[in-house]
Every structure is written in C-alpha cells, then in structure tokens.
Amino acid sequence: MEIKYTGMELKLHRHGIRTALASVFGAMLIATPFVGDSALANGIVTGKVFWFHLSMALMAIGTVVTAWPGGRKSIPFALPDGLLLLFAGITLATYDWQLDPEPEKLLFGGQLVVLWFLLRYFLTEAPCLKFFFLFVLMLTGLVEAVWGMQQLHGYAYSNHSLFRLTGSFFNPGPYCGYLAVVLPVCLWTALRFQKGMHYFGWVCAGAILIVLPAGMSRSAWMAAVVACGWVYWTERIGWEKTKAVCRRYKNATIPFIAIVAILVGCT
C-alpha cells in the first residue's frame, strides 16, 4: 500500500524525524559520564572519550541527513558565537604545531565548537528540546548524587582505591566538578520554572548539595558558590536592585568589594 504525503505532512514528518534524532543524540551526549568500558585500558576514562566521539559523529551525520532536504529556519549570529570562534582562532594560532603536545584535547575542543553550533541548529528548529535537555542533564546530576551517597555509605564500590567518593568517574576531582556544573543549572531551573520542573530542580539541587561537600574539592565548592550566586543574582536581584543598594549604602560598597576581592585572592 503506497502512502502519499502532502507538502505540509511531509514537512511535519521531517520535523518529527529531526526532533527525534536530536533527542536521542543529545541524550547520548549528556549520558557520557555514565559510560565505561572494562575491555579498554583505563576504561572509565577512555570509554567516556570514545562514547563522546561516537555521539558527536552520529549527531553530525543526523544533522546533515535531516537538514539537507527542505527549508530551514535562519539562525542569527549572536555575540557568544563570535566569542567562541575568536577563542578557537586564538587557540589554533598559539598552539605549538611542531611539538603537538595535546592532539586529543585539540580534537576535543574542535568537537565542542561543532557541538555548540549543532545545538544552536537543533534548538532553533525545535525549541521544545530545551526542556528535554535540561531534564536529562539534571537527571544525570541526580543519579550521580545518589550514586555518591551509596558509595559513602558502602552500598556501592568506588572507582579508585584511595577515594571513597568517585561516582561514575575515576576520582573525586571530575566527579565534584561535574556536580558543580549541574548544580547552578538545577538552581536556575528551580527559580525560573513552576510546577514540575520547579520541584524537580530543587530535588536535584538538594541531592547535589548533600553529597558535594563530601568530595573535599575546594575548586568545585568555589565554582558552585560563584555560579549559584550569579544565577540567583540574575533571577532574583538584577542590576536595578543592585544599583539601588549601592546608592543607599555607598560608603560601605567600596570596602565590601575590597574585602571580597582580598578573600577571593587569598583562596
């Protein structure tokens, strides 16, 4: 039986395929921290690296296949795009090509640049994916936090003989760093949205806050405090309220800024 599509139906069909592929490949990328392969040398690390390469390749192929036919929305060039390209250009210009000390990191950085523009394309074509990616990212943070709690209480094994808390990573450093990255996202979601995403954001943030201090990573603590402070300032305070407070307490503003700068420098 032959199935015929009208122009609008064909367009919706292609849009659905594009959205489904973006959802699958995006979820694969976000789930990279959970990947490990015991058949590889240092499989906890190399497994994640190979999985990221595979996910990026599939995402790029899926983008080419779905973007080739039909019309597409125009993606405006924004300031972050220019800053990212400028940073990539400076990195390439200052890299020691003769010595070539970090080819793997150079490849990884190039893939991140490509990933940025792939996400720009997919989120422009299907804005609903923003909520899906947010949910999956926060879910990974919640799973990592629960995983860490199980390791602390002896219900799960750690991946390092010297550390009790590693999550799905090899040591506490990247584990705490990942939690510090996901935490401000959870806080932003809890402050920005209502109902389901609001409560889920607070649950994820609370779970991360419980386990993050046990990682004993001061850099992760500082990153989490600064990022969460910035998120709260943008969502609840803003520049206008800040200027009003500075004008009201102008005699104490400069000493306060100086003390904060000294404390940050000492740490």
Task: Outline where the language-model segments fall.
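Short, hydrophobic transmembrane alpha-helix segments
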Residues: 35-49, 68-73
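Alpha-helix initiation/capping motif
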Residues: 36, 45, 77-78, 194-196
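Alpha-helical transmembrane segments of multi-pass inner-membrane proteins
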Residues: 13, 17-35, 53-65, 85-96, ...
